[in-house]
Swiss-Prot record:
Heterotetramer; composed of two copies of TRMT6 and two copies of TRMT61A. It comes from Bos taurus. It is found in: Nucleus. Residues 94-104, 145-154, 175-182, 415-423, 434-441 are annotated as: Substrate. It comes from the Eukaryota. One of its GO terms (cellular component) is tRNA (m1A) methyltransferase complex. The keyword Acetylation does not apply. Keywords: Nucleus, Phosphoprotein, tRNA processing. Substrate-binding subunit of tRNA (adenine-N(1)-)-methyltransferase, which catalyzes the formation of N(1)-methyladenine at position 58 (m1A58) in initiator methionyl-tRNA. Together with the TRMT61A catalytic subunit, part of a mRNA N(1)-methyltransferase complex that mediates methylation of adenosine residues at the N(1) position of a small subset of mRNAs: N(1) methylation takes place in tRNA T-loop-like structures of mRNAs and is only present at low stoichiometries. This is tRNA (adenine(58)-N(1))-methyltransferase non-catalytic subunit TRM6. The keyword Transcription does not apply. Belongs to the TRM6/GCD10 family.
Length: 497
């Protein structure tokens, strides 16, 4: 048994403490709305129609709640004891309350004047309660609902949390589900479990979910093991992966390989010369997209319009715009100096990427991967049938698709091909519950679906096909139906005698 000292592992993401530092990736949370940003000094962030700077969150621990004050400054929110139900004056019935719009004495001009004076949202909510003629007549539950509604409107409270698979998957599913193929967060959790994602594995992943599945696998593996990502087009899309904020040590076990070179790798005709044109395309995509900071700035300006805009008719172009450079030291030519230095840096990156592609090809050629994860917008059948050859026997594979019919076809093809067992097509059912004192119940609105999963295990085929065995068993059953068993034939004459 090898000791842990022989294999030094990667350093933890936040050594020593859980404080927010300059350059970290964080997630801003307000009620049920999330947004992932990178912490930078004097960087203007727009979130939920409010703008502010992130300077004051540096040094605070994750989970701290801040209040947006005048001038875009964030101030830590002090926790105050809420009044208990015994001190509240509440009515017993809401039937006598008439909603005529005249119960509030404060007008919109009065509220605007309070905001202009710099009065905090908490004080505005308190004045709204005091100037409401029907507040004390409402039941205790109605009062809590009223206060919660007014706090959401007038109090600008933002909580800074650490990025995780669950938080980022909830964020993408709520704001831009098309970029992750409408994969719900519980479906992603099922994929990680069925795929047996753990530290030390050698995994293959083919996904077009903006890098969310890849980031979830990297988080669960903790920097131990290796992941080979197969990508279509000019380069891998890792916008969601960058939001995790993984350290550089996590990237040492991450490899990439173009999907259009898989057939040549299976046929044994793959060579290094075939990769000569690949890095040039990736560099041009990165050059056209700009850095991560420029991309996030443009996202902040168009934040509200993105959520309401229809999906693009060209998903490949839409995803290519999300490509993020893996090298944080890389700079655009306008920042790196002369054009000659930029060309040399570009050539160095191309050679380095070509080397990583060759390393990925060598890992795939061993055909001993510990698992396969497929979650793409393409038809799963040809992808799975070709990629299963790289997986070792007795290893799991999981395929995600937004629709059931492609997975049914894939299920049939796998049965005909053989070499797999325990095939299972599943769909998870998720329902959220409101859990509050004396009023816990399922929420009225719920998700209609989170996609479908096809899972199974690989086995050694021993050069045998599945079809003849299936047909022989079927023909045997048919012969038993048409002809009586021999034992029953012998018993019939004995009973007559």
């Amino acid at each position: 048994m090898e000791s842990s000292e022989d294999q030094p592992g990667p350093q933890p993401q936040y050594p020593g403490n859980h404080c927010i530092r300059d350059g970290d990736f964080v997630v801003l949370k307000r009620e049920d709305v999330f947004k992932a940003v990178q912490v930078q000094r004097r960087k203007k962030v727009t979130f939920e129609k409010q703008w502010f700077y992130l300077d004051n969150i540096i040094g605070h621990s994750y989970g701290t709640t801040f209040e947006v004050t005048n001038g875009g400054s964030l101030q830590p929110k002090k926790k105050k004891e809420e009044p208990t139900s015994e001190t509240k004056e509440a009515g017993t019935d809401n039937r006598n309350i008439i909603d005529d719009g005249k119960s509030q004495k404060l007008t919109q001009d009065d509220i605007k004047a309070l905001k202009d004076k710099g009065i905090k949202g908490e004080e505005i909510v308190q004045q709204l309660i005091e100037n409401s003629t029907t507040f004390r007549d409402k039941t205790e539950f109605a009062q809590d609902k009223y206060i919660k509604k007014k706090k959401k409107k007038y109090e600008a409270m933002i909580t800074v949390v650490k990025p995780s698979t669950r938080i980022l998957s909830v964020m993408y599913y709520a704001r831009e589900p098309g970029k992750i193929n409408h994969m719900r967060y519980d479906t992603l959790a099922q994929m990680l479990t069925l795929g047996n994602i753990r530290a030390g594995n050698k995994m293959i992943v083919m996904e077009t979910c903006a890098g969310l599945v890849l980031g979830a696998m990297m988080e669960r593996m903790g920097g131990f093991g290796s992941i080979i990502q197969l990508y279509p087009g000019g380069g891998p899309v890792r916008a969601a992966t960058a939001c995790f904020g993984f350290p550089k040590s996590f990237l040492s076990g991450l490899y990439e390989f173009p999907l259009n070179k898989v057939d040549s790798l299976l046929n044994g005709t793959f060579s290094a010369e075939m990769l000569s044109s690949e890095p040039k395309d990736i560099a041009s995509v990165e050059e056209s997209n700009g850095t991560l900071e420029e991309k996030q700035t443009s996202e902040q300006e168009n934040e509200d319009s993105i959520a309401e805009a229809p999906e693009s008719n060209h998903p490949e172009e839409q995803e290519r715009m999300e490509i993020v450079s893996q090298d944080p030291d890389y700079k655009e030519p306008k920042e790196s100096g002369s054009k000659k230095d930029y060309i040399q840096e570009k050539q160095r990156r191309q050679e380095e990427q070509k080397k990583r592609h060759l390393e990925a090809a060598a890992l795939l050629s061993e055909r001993n991967a510990d698992g396969l994860i497929v979650a793409s917008r393409f038809h799963p059948t040809p992808l799975l049938l070709s990629l299963l050859d790289f997986v070792a026997p007795s290893r799991p594979f999981v395929v995600y698709c937004q629709y059931k019919e492609p997975l049914l076809e894939c299920y049939t093809k796998l049965r005909e091909r053989g070499g797999v067992i325990n095939l299972r097509l599943s769909e998870t059912w998720l329902r959220n519950y409101q859990v509050l004192p004396d009023r816990s119940h399922p929420k009225l609105l719920m998700s209609g679906g989170g996609g479908y999963l096809l899972s199974g295990f690989t086995v050694a085929m021993d050069n045998l096909k599945a079809d003849p065995s299936l047909k022989s068993s079927t023909s045997t059953l048919e012969s038993h139906k048409t002809e009586e068993p021999a034992a029953k034939k012998r018993k019939c004459p004995e009973s007559d005698s």
